[in-house]
Amino acid sequence: MNHSRSHALFSQAQNLMPGGVNSPVRAFKSVGGEPFFVARADGAYLFDVDGNRYIDYVGSWGPMIAGHNHPAVREAVERAIRDGLSFGAPCEAEVTMAETITRLVPSCEMVRMVNSGTEATLSAIRLARGATGRNRIVKFEGCYHGHGDSFLVKAGSGMLTLGVPTSPGVPAGLSELTATLSFNDFEGATALFDEIGAEVAAVIIEPVVGNANCIPPQAGYLQHLRTLCTRHGALLIFDEVMTGFRVALGGAQAHYGVTPDLTTFGKIIGGGMPVGAYGGGRDLMEQISPAGPIYQAGTLSGNPVAMAAGLAMLQLVQEPGFHARLSETTSLLCEGLEDAARAAGVAVTTNQVGGMFGLFFTDQIVENYAQATACDVTTFNRFFHAMLQQGVYLAPSAYEAGFVSSAHDEAVIEATLAAAREAFADVMR
């Protein structure tokens, strides 16, 4: 493939932006080489500035669940912008969005719109601290909840990709208020609550880890956390920025039958535009200003164009059978990848929940951060580039989940698996 235009743009970008990108994982530092620059996207495909086409399993890191540039979403945006881009005042679309979320998500009786997943998680933590009068939070190794200071302790996503345990610039005192557990560790969670349970404001968790690749919870684990939080008076927060409306219509909480106190959203509810939200029970949410004393605000929150895009996307995922078909397609992909690896003699396992999947270069089932980081990253990197050269774009890190959309039909999956058979053979040469 020719990448001359992408190379020129990346060289220019490195003089203008830190690392040449606006989010670290995009720089390809984990996998090596240089990123391609996207010109446009459609359905299951990305097209770069050099004219190359890629089957896309990143999907803008999750929100493109109906494929890129879906006509219904695009048309909703086109209609909305005729009325203006931003009002800084209430609009009908944000009321409709709130009604939709509260109708579909078990934990949400009220919801507040924000502008990103990071903003949603920061706001949820502030609410939890204000509502409980406590300061400590509990998170999990490899889980990423945005770049707020409290979360950059043994975080996933770009932090894990770069091998940084805790970011410089995070005050030690703030880090000391964040306790970290191993995901899927029942005994560790119990022991921690026995020790500091009375000080914990909230437990925040990705119910399916999507930022240390894709790691589902063991049976009963989320319920165990729910029980501990209830017993000790702490709030349980599900970060459903990735899982919300993707693994099931009601998110991971509906899929696993465990209801948190607060839920954070992003990605899909903006249809690809910058949006976030957090929601929970009425008694908690009415403590947020102006209804209550816990302050949170945002000029662009509830932006009418973003609301229009998100509502169109949520309408699509409510179609009968949408999530069942998405899960079937993802299973077909994962089974095919494992078969192709096995035939080539490459140790690979996969995890899948709905339309999310993880590809691990190991012969062991991966259930936590430590196991994810023990996988063969060198072989993954070679596989990544072999796939990219054949026009298949996986996340440029061994520690990021993959995403399938409804635009990934059987022909797209078969083309992916044909490329994988070649790529697995390449890494064994």
From Swiss-Prot:
Q: Per its UniProt record, what CDD domains does this chain match?
A: OAT_like (cd00610)
Q: Where is it located?
A: Cytoplasm
Q: Which GO terms describe its molecular function?
A: glutamate-1-semialdehyde 2,1-aminomutase activity; pyridoxal phosphate binding; transaminase activity
Keywords attached to this Swiss-Prot or TrEMBL record, sorted alphabetically, are: Cytoplasm, Isomerase, Porphyrin biosynthesis, Pyridoxal phosphate
The record's InterPro entries line, in alphabetical order, gives: 4pyrrol_synth_GluAld_NH2Trfase (IPR004639), Aminotrans_3 (IPR005814), Aminotrans_3_PPA_site (IPR049704), PyrdxlP-dep_Trfase (IPR015424), PyrdxlP-dep_Trfase_major (IPR015421), PyrdxlP-dep_Trfase_small (IPR015422)
| Pfam families listed in its UniProt record | Aminotran_3
Q: Which reaction does it catalyse?
A: (S)-4-amino-5-oxopentanoate = 5-aminolevulinate
Q: Which cofactor does it need?
A: pyridoxal 5'-phosphate
List the GO biological process terms.
protoporphyrinogen IX biosynthetic process
Record-listed N6-(pyridoxal phosphate)lysine modification sites: 267
SUPFAM superfamilies xrefs: PLP-dependent transferases
Q: Which cellular component appears as one GO term in the record?
A: cytoplasm
Q: Which PROSITE patterns match?
A: AA_TRANSFER_CLASS_3
Q: What is its EC number?
A: 5.4.3.8
Q: Which PANTHER family match?
A: GLUTAMATE-1-SEMIALDEHYDE 2,1-AMINOMUTASE (PTHR43713), GLUTAMATE-1-SEMIALDEHYDE 2,1-AMINOMUTASE 1, CHLOROPLASTIC-RELATED (PTHR43713:SF3)
Q: Which family does it belong to?
A: Belongs to the class-III pyridoxal-phosphate-dependent aminotransferase family. HemL subfamily.
What do we know about how this protein assembles, alone or with others? Homodimer.
What is this protein's name? Answer: Glutamate-1-semialdehyde 2,1-aminomutase
